[in-house]
């Protein structure tokens, strides 16, 4: 099955009160694990590459070729979107689109709102004629991800409305208390703000920093308009724990596949668990 935009995918998720998981890839095995989990769960999925890891992964063309090849080799039948996570510049988003990414996030959240809107509008103008979906962010998701460190800044309602109406985006990441990386204590999401932003904007919301959030908060966030939830830290932790256990228990092991296969298997199980938590399992039948 060919890669798809996440636009219709998220519309259906929002209407059906479930969320599509975004899972970041870190190499070939991660892509295989994410796609395997999606196929086994019959769940639509968003495979993402963080802009800060694109060069590490070999570049935009390499990532697109890898994922497209895996769709064929693994006989994937579920809807899959390839997404640029936290696109740093307009040009980087355009490069991703030209390489075959079917969705991009332009992260102008660290800029004044006027600049954020201007950047987002330019990306949307380039993306929409090419059937590529666009996500934008308002406010700042705290924590650390791929070397980026930041504090939490709640999304402003008026700014959210402006970005949606003026830039015509497909999905909005409104920062409402979630963080990238491990949480210190239980997360406290801004549900009251979430409800108002969802009602005023009408677009599918995106929850960044979805790792480690209790199930009851995830469910509430979905009911209040979140149709996309990003997960990376839990997969990283599961992979690291599995590989660390192998290396600790067998000091003489050196075969790469023997060392890393348990890590890949741990990612598969983590992704499947999150898909069930997000109520996405079985939703691939609702074709996009």
Swiss-Prot record:
Gene3D superfamilies: Aldolase class I (3.20.20.70). Pathway: Polyol metabolism; myo-inositol degradation into acetyl-CoA; acetyl-CoA from myo-inositol: step 6/7. Zn(2+) binds at residues 86, 180, 208. InterPro entries: Aldolase_TIM, Class_II_FBP_aldolase, FBA_II, Fruc_bis_ald_class-2. The modification Phosphothreonine is found at residue 233. GO terms for biological process: fructose 1,6-bisphosphate metabolic process; glycolytic process. It catalyses: 6-phospho-5-dehydro-2-deoxy-D-gluconate = 3-oxopropanoate + dihydroxyacetone phosphate. GO terms for molecular function: 5-dehydro-2-deoxyphosphogluconate aldolase activity; fructose-bisphosphate aldolase activity; zinc ion binding. Its cofactor is Zn(2+). Disulfide bonds: none annotated. Keywords: Lyase, Metal-binding, Phosphoprotein, Zinc. The active site is at 85 (proton donor). Pfam families: F_bP_aldolase. Its EC number is 4.1.2.29. Dihydroxyacetone phosphate binds at residues 181, 209-211, 230-233. Produces dihydroxyacetone phosphate (DHAP or glycerone phosphate) and malonic semialdehyde (MSA or 3-oxopropanoate) from 6-phospho-5-dehydro-2-deoxy-D-gluconate (DKGP). NCBIfam families: cbbA, fruc_bis_ald. Belongs to the class II fructose-bisphosphate aldolase family. IolJ subfamily. This is 6-phospho-5-dehydro-2-deoxy-D-gluconate aldolase. The gene is iolJ.
